[in-house]
């Protein structure tokens, strides 16, 4: 199981195929996505990679967070997240993951925070049909109607679909196809819509319900400071010694 990446949503556009068909895509940018630390089964009880992306001024960081970035020898990051991986998919601390970590044609799962809609009624929030336009209905055409409570049970049950705050939820969209990657600019173009507003942080992972392509690099495509790109086929320090 490979690591995912932390990307930033740039916006939507479209690309054209050789046949002239257009594909709507969302542009995701990798903003210096680096490995900050490892989580091991011996020390933490599970195996994961801690990644950071974006830039943040040191003056706004608490001392504890400054120390974490100092240990990893990386610049302070705006967004930090963990990705569960297998033991053979650990990437060295300080390495920067590249856009070609994902290959064209593979499917990915994306997770983000949906756009806030504020207080919404039942028709917008839950797709209710509303009440009749005439025949005795006045003013309350868009109301939700009965909430289901009579003398028995004498209450409205929890989790009843009612008007309330809509949006700003953690949303995952499955099986989006990677259309194109740009390593130089750190861009990943995925087909379809991605949850969140422009500038929002998105977690991109290999699709859990689709097979991983055979040409996908393992443990990933990354760059170590002062070195060229490294893949799983490259020898480790112990093997080269």
UniProtKB/Swiss-Prot annotation:
Keyword Nucleotide-binding: no
Superkingdom of the source species: Bacteria
Annotated stretches, region: Disordered: 139-166, 209-241
Gene3D superfamilies: 3.30.160.810, Translation factors
Keyword list, A-Z: Methylation, Ribonucleoprotein, Ribosomal protein, RNA-binding, rRNA-binding
GO cellular component term of the entry, any: cytosolic large ribosomal subunit
Its biological purpose: One of the primary rRNA binding proteins, it binds directly near the 3'-end of the 23S rRNA, where it nucleates assembly of the 50S subunit.
Family recorded in the similarity comment: Belongs to the universal ribosomal protein uL3 family.
Protein name: Large ribosomal subunit protein uL3
Gene name of the record: rplC
């Amino acid at each position: 199981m490979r690591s995912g990446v932390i990307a930033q949503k740039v916006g939507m556009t479209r690309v054209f195929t050789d046949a002239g068909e257009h594909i709507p895509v969302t542009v995701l940018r990798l903003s210096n996505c680096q490995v900050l630390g490892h989580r091991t089964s011996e020390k933490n009880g599970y195996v994961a990679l801690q990644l950071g992306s974006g830039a943040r001024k040191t003056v706004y960081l608490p001392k504890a967070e400054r120390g974490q970035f100092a240990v990893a020898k990386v610049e302070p990051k705006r967004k930090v997240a963990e990705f569960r991986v297998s033991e053979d998919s650990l990437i060295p601390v300080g390495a920067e993951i590249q856009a070609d970590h994902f290959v064209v044609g593979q499917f990915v799962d994306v997770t983000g925070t949906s756009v806030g809609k504020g207080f919404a009624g039942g028709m917008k929030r839950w797709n209710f049909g509303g009440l009749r336009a005439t025949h005795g209905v006045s003013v309350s055409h868009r109301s939700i109607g009965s909430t289901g409570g009579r003398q028995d049970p004498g209450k409205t049950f929890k989790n009843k679909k009612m008007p309330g705050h809509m949006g700003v939820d953690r949303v995952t969209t499955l099986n989006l196809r990677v259309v194109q990657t740009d390593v130089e600019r750190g861009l990943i173009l995925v087909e379809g819509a991605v949850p969140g507003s422009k500038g929002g942080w998105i977690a991109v992972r290999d699709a859990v319900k689709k097979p991983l392509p055979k040409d996908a690099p393992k443990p990933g495509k990354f760059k170590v400071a002062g070195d060229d790109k490294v893949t799983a086929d490259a020898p480790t320090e112990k093997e080269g010694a």
